[in-house]
Amino acid sequence: NLAGSGCIRANGGAGYWDGFAGPGGGGGRGAVTLTGADSFGSVAIQAYGGEYPGPTYDGAAGSVYLRTQGQGASEGLLVVDNGGRSPNRTTDISSNVTGTAVGSVIIRNNANLQVNSNQSVTVGGNWSNTAAFTALSNSLVTLSGTGTAAVFGSHTFERFVCTNGGKTVQFSVGHTNGVMKVLKLTGESGNRLLLRSVSPGQLWLLKADADAVQTVDWVDVQDSDARPGVAISALNTVGSNTYNWSFAAAGVTNAWV
């Protein structure tokens, strides 16, 4: 359990050499797991980048991973928060990072979460971005599990995948989610993947690049505007209030006897 109202900090420091201020250090990587409670109470937990006297050389945000007593190792909350520092440095998911499957993600306060080339992040719950997200070549974001998830904010993904029939994925209104290389959204017969707006009746925006490989099958989509990109070609899919979506049935095999 955590008690009190203090602050746990893993903030980066500002470097000084020979009286001159160096760029701020990156925030640390912290994790807190509760074994007897489901609330972190009033305790603040930070991993901000170090500050620099000038406007552009603050350090990158670190990360904080929070788990309550009932959450498994990959069910916690990943927070990437830079405390309003300058947004010029990235918090990288690189090949050196372990534990890239999480429950939910929050990116905020001038943080910039970057998934490096050929790296991946798997998220079972919500993805909330009010700061910045960078996807390098061939990086992958996967939405896992069957519980309802929401994607808040605008993003440009390299590869974006959800293959969980029965799952509902909601998207925020007024934000665009772009996909550059792979868009894979699939449910299964009798158990479609549901794509919805966070605000029913209001459009969420999808932008598929012309070079993106699309696999969209057994989906139920509502309130989606794909006109920012190329048309979405979907098999075995139903939809309402959609724009730039093309619905088709799977091919039928004729047997001659």
Which sequence ranges carry the predicted segments?
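Sequence/structural signature of small/polar-enriched beta-strand/turn repeats
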Residues: N1-G166, S172-V257
